[in-house]
Amino acid sequence: MYAEITFPLHAQRGAAYLTAPNIPARHAFSTRLGGVSTGVLESLNLSVRRGDTPENVRENWRRLGAAAGLDLTRAVYAKQVHSADVRIAHAADAQPPEHEPRFTCDGFVTNEPDVTLAVFMADCLPALLHDPAAGVIGAVHCGWRGSVADILGAAVAQMCALGAHPED
């Protein structure tokens, strides 16, 4: 028997996003609803790699962040390569979203409360991990290659290095 979980849709401030009710840490799953991008990208496009202008991408990230209560104008994100590599993220790693990513990996963990972690999905799965007792969070891009290579195990190990306990 599977538990049914509903992901509420929130639409405000020019963007729409989903949340998971069983994750107490502030988070958002973006949608394509809202935004200022035009033409074939007409939506809440979050990537300059699709041919959108940096200004549109920056504004779309700003709108999503304003709607979700997150500072997405500076986030930690990576060039995702379907690996099992998970990095510990720090505030100094954050950068504007229209810049090329500094890191090549498929997940981040942090224990710094003001660090926003971002991972991108297409046909892969996101995993958000949270140890509320230790104040450690993780965001992981789970493609099939990374899943086979145990990216979630790597994320839990990195979280444990920051003081998390899997049972929490």
Question: What are these regions, as identified by a protein language model?
Answer:
Residues 25-26, 73-76, 166-168:
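Residue-level recognition of the N-termini of beta-strands and the immediately preceding loop/turn
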Residues 29, 34-37, 65-68, 72, ...:
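Short amphipathic alpha-helical segments enriched in hydrophobics
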Residues 23, 53-61, 148, 152:
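Generic structural signal for well-ordered, non-membrane alpha-helical segments
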Residues 1-29, 33-34, 39:
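Conserved nucleotide-ligand handling architecture
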Residues 2-5, 13, 114-116, 124, ...:
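Surface-exposed, charge/polar-rich loops and edge strands
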Residues 54, 58-142:
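Phosphate-centric recognition/catalysis
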Residues 39-52:
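Glycine-/proline-rich flexible loop or hinge segments
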Residues 38-39, 86-87, 146-149:
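Short acidic/glycine-rich loop or secondary-structure boundary segments that cap or lie
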